[in-house]
Amino acid sequence: MVATGIIRSRLPEHTRIVCHIKDPRLPAIAEAKGCTKTAAAVDLWQEDGLLDGAVIAMGNAPTALFRVLEVMRETGARPAAIVGIPVGFVGAAESKDALVADDSGVEYITVLGRRGGSAMAVAAVNAMASRAETTNDR
């Protein structure tokens, strides 16, 4: 849902928006690893070399946010920024607390507690893109 809401015209030319959630490989990967499809999608991002330098945005998947932080620790991957605003009662607050506590130095945007969601994540990404566009900092 985040990928759908991003205003592509505000992004630098040739910017890719990658969402693996509909990737047919995900169910098998998730089952083999004993994780959620969204967490498995993070592994696909890493395998495809897409984490380093990327802006990672999540609005609904605390397990994916946890996995991004794990992959960063395990591999040294370094996104440019993380917009981590998962919503919900199970793991959402904890995943955002883990993001805040992360000592990698990667910039982040979050909303502490259980509130969040795709709309907030999209708004944050679009605001960053708009700001970069108006300051020529793309």
Residue ranges of predicted features:
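Long, charge-dense
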Residues: A3-A54
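Feature captures the catalytic cores and cofactor-binding loops of soluble hydro-lyases/lyases
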Residues: A64-A81, A93-E94, L99-A101
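Glycine-rich phosphate-binding loops that contact phosphosugars or nucleotide phosphates
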Residues: T38, M58-E74, V90, A124
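Buried hydrophobic positions in well-ordered alpha/beta secondary-structure cores of metabolic enzymes
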Residues: V83-G84, A124
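Structural motif
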Residues: T15-V18, G53-A57, P79-V83, V106-T110, ...
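Solvent-exposed alpha-helices and their adjacent loops that cap or buttress functional pockets
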Residues: S9-L11, Q46-L51, R73-A77, V100-D103, ...
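Short glycine/serine/threonine-rich phosphate/pyrophosphate-binding segments
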Residues: V2-G5, T63-V68, F89-A93, G117-A121
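C-terminal functional extensions of proteins
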Residues: V90-R138
